Regions:
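Bacterial N-terminal signal peptides
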Residues: 9-18
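Outer membrane beta-barrel
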Residues: 71-272, 349-382, 386-404
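N-terminal periplasmic/intermembrane-space "pro-region" immediately following the signal or transit peptide
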Residues: 17-94, 361, 365-376, 406-408, ...
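Bacterial N-terminal signal peptides that target proteins for export
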Residues: 1-8
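Residue-level marker for the onset of beta-strands and adjacent loop->beta junctions
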Residues: 65, 74, 150, 201, ...
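Outer-membrane beta-barrel pore domains
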Residues: 103-104, 142, 153-155, 256-258, ...
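A general secondary-structure boundary signal
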Residues: 38-53, 92-94, 118-120, 151-158, ...
Length: 466
């Protein structure tokens, strides 16, 4: 403003001088000198104005290149101005309560089910990475699995239909297993998840085809027993192949079948080691293979030793506030019984299935992915979050070949059938409270600690995730 005013005054003076006739040589010289100074002043003003323009342009360029920092329900995000580099700090905590009804021998308890800090981001636009750890008390740690490190991988997005992921991550098998841990319908996943592999180390090719209507994944992994996770495989040179194809045939239509998803997955490989036991939704073990020194019949020891394959047809359907999810898993494993003398071998086929339904009373659109409440919880503004009702039924059946040589029929059940109901209160996208009732009937195992009676348990959870 001051520069513009100086220019205006100088222009007026110059105009006045030019309009006054010269009265003499001296006066003419003075006028010429004054006009010269005014011209110099105008030049200086122009230089200053250009300098200000350049400074403004530089400031705009600096602002354009400056990284962007944001905080919200998606976590703490640091992003370069061109979005080619992104760093996100996220995490979640789940605090659970387990309360057993009737004459159960299990103890009621509170526990930290999951405590998971997450670091993820993008490098050079196409290379995504993720590191997730877990410090909860329920983390399983073995000689081949650092239970603290759950995810540690890089995903190269060369094209939507051609992506290469390597590191430690979930094998592409179980439908509910692949669902995010902070987006579960029930406190604990269903029986099929216990037969599907969890996280494994390997490399996987995956992507979306045909306008996003088909997702595929195929990979090579170390291989893990049912429900297990591994970092490395020191004793088994064989690797597993895992594959999955999942289709949304009506995704790009406006029909009521738009939310239908159908798929099949499976694994094939060879495993060795101690086979896993199986537990109820209340985390009571109801089946275990015999375990001993392996020197005689009384101390028989069972080991996985040979071919393993899995097959899992799966589907879900969402329409408005309604959701339905179902899956079936067959897991076949060759086992060896050591009890002195020649080992006894057998191929086992264990199966599990579940069907789970959900409905949002508050009208939100249901989804396999996390749902955003229409109105976050805020009583002052008549906001009460989203209320979701859930129900499921499922079964796990153990191969009859296991009894009595490979498992004790008195203490281990031959199968378990369960049903449950529950409610999820989504206060907002980051906070959720869950309450479940689960009933489980056990077949066999009449003298087992967990299987001598049916299990009735109330499970509760408060979750914070960002």
């Amino acid at each position: 403003m001051r520069i513009q005013r100086s220019v205006a005054i100088a222009a007026l003076i110059a105009a006045s001088l030019k309009s006054v006739p010269a009265s003499g040589g001296a006066d003419s010289g003075v006028a010429s000198e004054l006009l010269k100074r005014i011209d110099e002043l105008e030049q200086k003003v122009k230089v200053l104005e250009r300098k200000r323009e350049l400074e403004g342009e530089a400031a705009e360029e600096t602002a354009r290149k400056a990284p962007v920092v944001s905080i919200g329900s998606g976590g703490f995000t640091f992003r370069s101005a061109d979005t080619n580099f992104v760093l996100k700090l996220r995490g979640g905590v789940q605090t659970d309560g387990r309360f057993y009804l009737g004459n159960s021998s299990a103890n009621d308890s509170f526990l930290l089910r999951r405590v998971r800090p997450i670091v993820e981001g993008t490098l050079f636009e196409k290379y995504d990475f993720r590191i997730m750890t877990d410090f909860a008390s329920g983390v399983t740690q073995t000689t081949v699995n650092n239970g603290t490190i759950l995810d540690a991988y890089v995903n190269a997005r060369f094209a939507p239909g051609f992506q290469l992921q390597f590191g430690k991550f979930k094998e592409p098998v179980g439908l509910e297993r692949l669902q995010s841990w902070y987006n579960l319908l029930f406190v604990e996943r269903g029986f099929p998840t216990q037969l599907a592999p969890n996280r494994d180390t390997g490399v996987m090719l995956h992507g979306e085809l045909f306008s996003g209507t088909v997702n595929y994944a195929v990979g090579a992994f170390n291989g893990t027993l049912d429900g297990g996770s591994t970092d490395f495989d020191a004793s088994d040179p064989d690797k597993d192949v895992a594959a999955r194809v999942f289709s949304h045939p009506f995704k790009n239509t406006g029909t009521l079948w738009k939310g239908l998803g159908l798929g099949v997955s499976g694994t094939y490989g060879s495993h060795s080691g101690t086979p896993r036991s199986y537990a109820s939704h209340g985390s009571q073990r109801f089946f275990a293979y015999r375990s001993g020194a392996g020197t005689n019949a009384a101390t028989a020891n069972i080991l996985a030793d040979g071919t393993n394959w899995r097959l899992s047809p799966q589907a879900y359907y969402y329409w408005g506030p309604f959701g339905l999810l179902g899956e079936y898993v067959i897991s076949s494993q060759e086992l060896r019984r050591d009890a002195g003398g020649a080992p006894v071998r057998a191929q086992f086929k264990n199966t599990a299935w579940q069907v789970a339904a959900s409905y949002f009373l508050t009208g939100e659109d249901n989804s396999y992915k996390p749902v955003q409440p229409r109105r976050n919880f805020n009583p002052a503004n008549s906001g009460w979050g989203a209320l979701e009702l859930t129900a499921r039924v499922g079964e796990l059946d153990l191969d009859d070949v296991a009894f009595p040589l490979f498992a004790n029929p008195a203490t281990s059940a031959t199968g378990a059938f369960s049903w449950g109901v529950g409610a999820n209160w989504h206060l907002n996208r980051s906070v959720k409270a869950t309450l479940n009732f689960e009933h489980t009937d056990f077949k066999g195992g009449s003298t087992g600690v967990a299987t001598a009676q049916d299990e009735n348990v109330i499970l509760g959870r408060v979750q914070v995730f960002f």
